[in-house]
C-alpha cells in the first residue's frame, strides 16, 4: 500500500496550485496536516529575488534562498540561507500530532541545505503518510529509494492539471486512512 503521494511536473505547470487545493480540502475536513512550502518571492519590479520556507500552519518562516543577503551554498542564481534549517526542523517536533506531512517542494534548493535535507530524510523514515511535491529531475538516491516503492506518483501536465487535484486528494485520503487503521477515511 502507498503511504506517500508524490506530485511532479515541469516548472510552472500547476504543482503548487494542486498541492494547496488538496491540503486545504484535507484541513477543512479535520485532517491534521503539518509540513512546509517554499514560495518564490518577487521584488518591486516583479522579478524573483528568492524563496522562503514557510510552515503550513503559519507559525514560522525564513528565507530559503536569495540572490543576495545569504551566505549558504549557491544554487543557480541564489545563495541558500542556513536559517531555513531551523524552520524545516520544526516539522519533526510536529510528527506525533500530524495525520499527514506535506512538503512543497523537495528540490535542489531545499536539498542543498544539510539541515533541510536531514529533516526530509527523517520525515520519510517516520512512516507518516506524506504528500510531497518533488522537482521533476529529483536525483537524490536516499529520497527516491523511499518514494519509489511506497509512493503513488502523479505527473502534472497542462492537459491533466484540472482533473488531478481530486485524484491526488483521494490517494492522500486513503493513505491517511490506512495509517489510522481504517479502510475509508470518513471526514
UniProtKB/Swiss-Prot annotation:
SUPFAM superfamilies per UniProt: P-loop containing nucleoside triphosphate hydrolases
HAMAP family in UniProt: NTPase_1
Native organism: Hyperthermus butylicus (strain DSM 5456 / JCM 9403 / PLM1-5)
Domain of life: Archaea
Enzyme class: hydrolase
Catalysis: reaction(s): a ribonucleoside 5'-triphosphate + H2O = a ribonucleoside 5'-diphosphate + phosphate + H(+)
ATP-binding is among the record's keywords: yes
Xref: InterPro entries: Nuc-triphosphatase_THEP1, P-loop_NTPase
Family to which the UniProt record says this protein belongs: Belongs to the THEP1 NTPase family.
Database matches in Gene3D superfamilies: P-loop containing nucleotide triphosphate hydrolases (3.40.50.300)
Enzyme Commission number: 3.6.1.15
Example GO molecular function: ATP binding
Binding site for ATP: 9-16, 100-107
Alphabetized UniProt keyword annotations: ATP-binding, Hydrolase, Nucleotide-binding
Pfam families documented for this protein: NTPase_1
Function comment: Has nucleotide phosphatase activity towards ATP, GTP, CTP, TTP and UTP. May hydrolyze nucleoside diphosphates with lower efficiency.
Protein name: Nucleoside-triphosphatase THEP1
Amino acid at each position: 500500500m502507498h503511504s506517500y503521494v508524490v506530485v511532479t511536473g515541469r516548472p510552472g505547470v500547476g504543482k503548487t496550485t494542486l498541492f494547496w487545493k488538496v491540503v486545504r480540502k484535507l484541513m477543512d475536513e479535520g485532517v491534521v496536516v503539518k509540513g512546509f512550502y517554499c514560495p518564490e518571492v518577487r521584488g518591486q519590479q516583479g522579478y524573483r529575488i528568492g524563496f522562503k520556507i514557510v510552515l503550513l500552519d503559519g507559525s514560522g518562516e525564513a528565507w530559503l534562498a536569495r540572490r543576495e543577503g545569504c551566505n549558504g551554498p549557491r544554487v543557480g542564481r541564489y545563495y541558500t540561507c542556513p536559517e531555513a534549517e531551523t524552520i524545516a526542523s520544526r516539522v519533526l517536533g510536529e510528527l506525533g500530532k500530524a495525520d499527514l506531512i506535506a512538503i512543497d517542494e523537495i528540490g535542489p534548493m531545499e536539498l542543498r541545505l544539510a539541515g533541510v535535507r536531514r529533516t526530509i530524510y527523517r520525515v520519510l523514515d517516520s512512516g507518516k503518510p506524506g504528500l510531497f511535491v518533488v522537482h521533476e529531475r529529483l536525483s537524490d538516491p536516499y529520497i527516491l529509494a523511499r518514494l519509489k516503492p511506497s509512493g503513488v506518483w502523479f505527473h502534472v501536465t497542462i492537459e491533466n492539471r484540472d482533473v488531478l487535484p481530486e485524484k491526488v486528494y483521494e490517494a492522500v485520503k486513503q493513505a491517511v486512512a490506512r495509517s489510522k487503521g481504517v479502510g475509508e477515511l470518513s471526514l
